[in-house]
Amino acid sequence: MPTVISASVAPRTGAEPRSPGPIAQAAQGKGTEAGGGNPSGIYSAIISRNFPIIGVKEKTFEQLHRKCLEKKVLFVDPEFPPDETSLFYSQKFPIQFIWKRPPEICENPRFIIGGANRTDICQGDLGDCWFLAAIACLTLNERLLFRVIPHDQSFTENYAGIFHFQFWRYGDWVDVVIDDCLPTYNNQLVFTKSNHRNEFWSALLEKAYAKLHGSYEALKAGNTTEGMEDFTGELTEFFEIKDAPRDMYKIMKKAIERGSLMGCSIDDGTNMTYGTSPSGLKMGELIERMVRNMDNSRLRDSDLIPEGCSDDRPTRTIVPVQYETRMACGLVKGHAYSVTGLEEALYKGEKVKLVRLRNPWGQVEWNGSWSDSWKDWSYVDKDEKARLQHQVTEDGEFWMSYDDFIYHFTKLEICNLTADALESDKLQTWTVSVNEGRWVRGCSAGGCRNFPDTFWTNPQYRLKLLEEDDDPDDSEVICSFLVALMQKNRRKDRKLGANLFTIGFAIYEVPKEMHGNKQHLQKDFFLYNASKARSRTYINMREVSERFRLPPSEYVIVPSTYEPHQEGEFILRVFSEKRNLSEEVENTISVDRPVKKKKPKPIIFGSDRANSNKELGVDQESEEGKDNTSPDKQAKSPQLKPGNIDQESKEQRQFRNIFRQIAGDDMEICADELKNVLNRVVNKHKDLKTQGFTLESCRSMIALMDTDGSGRLNLQEFHHLWKKIKTWQKIFKHYDTDQSGTINSYEMRNAVNDAGFHLNNQLYDIITMRYADKYMNIDFDSFICCFVRLEGMFRAFNAFDKDGDGIIKLNVLEWLQLTMYA
């Protein structure tokens, strides 16, 4: 049974994974989301339909920059304005920050001084050390750095108060445009700053990342893996150091040589993620500490620039709010560090493995062996000492022995890069497949396998491992692959009360007889089959990743939250050393068509809606015995069937009599009359929970069943509808297992399939959102309305799909006729 914890666990170890392919070029578009223009992906048709309501396509950085230069104005970002709405969302800050542009803060402001490096990052009064540790790692790889931080920006040439940065966002690269207004207090930057007072790239990068997530407060607390992946688009592996392999130092050394990014931390005993406050520390307490800290800083010395003092003097760093726990050795629990180097040095004739780390605070350091104040430096060769100390010239960076490192630190993160990013042709590349998905409450949010009644409803992805690894030292026929499940937008939605879900996944082998059919595996399969592999546990992190080795075969991956009924979006990435194929199951949309014994005569209709319903002109269940009645008379005929009336059953005669009583002499019924006849019959079924069919539902039924465009139903049309309702009623009762008069929305998938409709996961999700109530139940009238609409829409599509290729072309009149009369 799965267990749930609130901290990460180590993945299975082995050779480090590699992400695939060349680096993608950053897309320029909407500042805070993936690209501009019309959206794509999940529910793309629905979102595209409403996209003009949300806003027009965003202008690119170049367009905005050029416009500001032409008008000779400084850019002000309307999406992330320089006011309190961009700072905190949980409560108002008691101190008034002043937003200033760099030229207003100091003389001679510079974007980058002497190249961006790890010493340019000093943490301010915000708990985002995890993000700053990732920046420090990023500065070690110039190629990656230049992609995230375009270097053609300055405060002199073509300065317009506008800057841009590029981040990976769930499969896409996005260009985030900001103005250069920064929050200050006593003329000092409140948040991240550089070691040089007049250098601003790190502060502006932090602002762009805050915009990406909606506010500065949204950056409080996180994992270095998040920042690493958003800077690279690559995959991060997570190690619990106490469970690390014996060759961990070798793994770290190899990662440094490859240019991989690494971060580490020490558990604070509260099961909180890096940079978070201890349990119980609210945002209000954090703000109070920030206020006290800034006031104390103001009293210590003046922030005014002394006359004749250059603005490029070192920044006096305000030590950030220390809700992390500082240890006697100088290390800080619950705090993120960057691993910036590894070396070996001779000490008393023996080789000692060393690790170089950096604290984003820029001040608080390790004070044990190999620290700046270490008393045994005299036992180290002078040249060796000079070489090591030359590499840690700034505050916040220090050496410690590898033994001390694994003794004190508890977690290590390694962000593995592509061969292109690593600038090496010899490194092994991995192939990748990416799938987007969504958990929808009441349909596809089934929870983990502790909940067998709903686990099977989760999204399922088929994985075909086609080729074994090339490993001459391994005789097993094995495929190595890595699965990474990432939940989307939870940090940005914090202000709406969203927190990270506890997520994980399981992998099952598909029986050979089911290979290639792409069917959604049912409840019984998971009840009687054990998983072949799974994430070690369920974790409340943005991404869960795990390395596996399985024989070539076909598998199904089931990603889920720990608890059922939790809604959210995710991406599922699969990396493998050899060729693999990963895709969502049930991606074919179709409807079972009745086998017709004779081809019906062509009928001419007066509208496109009627044309889309043309197959109802002939009874689908019994087409033999047709007479030579003309189409027009046939449509108006009061006869239930073209055959002999004497063959009618007692039920059919009763049906005809009821219909005649309601319809009158013209033998056609309108929506009001349809409502009366349906409710009159349904009310006799006390086992169906329904408040009766509404007038609007009946109007929709008429529109979807009307074969002649009259706006009414004749006997034949009504009989077809009634037979369908009776068939669907049996399906409804079959899935009403508790005889409550409703069915659980999770059962709607099977009910739809039993009715002959085959949909994909997105359509099942949409049906649940459209027809289920807040208790995830569907009553009888909603159930019938859903099936009538499916029947009508499939019939309409097939009527216009002349060549059967699954694509139709409509003009605006046809489109409006089909959608307005439905």
Swiss-Prot record:
Pfam families, alphabetically?
Calpain_III, Calpain_u2, CAPN13-like_C_EFh, EF-hand_8, Peptidase_C2
Q: How is its activity regulated?
A: Activated by micromolar concentrations of calcium and inhibited by calpastatin.
Bias (Basic and acidic residues)? 623-635
| Residue segments, region Linker | 588-649
Task: Name the chemical reaction catalysed here.
Answer: Broad endopeptidase activity
Main localisation, per the record? cytoplasm
User: What CDD domains does this protein's entry cite?
Assistant: Calpain_III, CysPc, EFh_PEF_CAPN3
Chain residues that bind Ca(2+) 2? D706, D708, S710, R712, E717
| Broadest EC class assigned to this enzyme | hydrolase
EF-hand domain ranges (all copies): 650-684, 693-726, 723-758, 788-822
Which protein family is named in the record? Answer: Belongs to the peptidase C2 family.
| Entry protein name | Calpain-3
Source species: Ovis aries
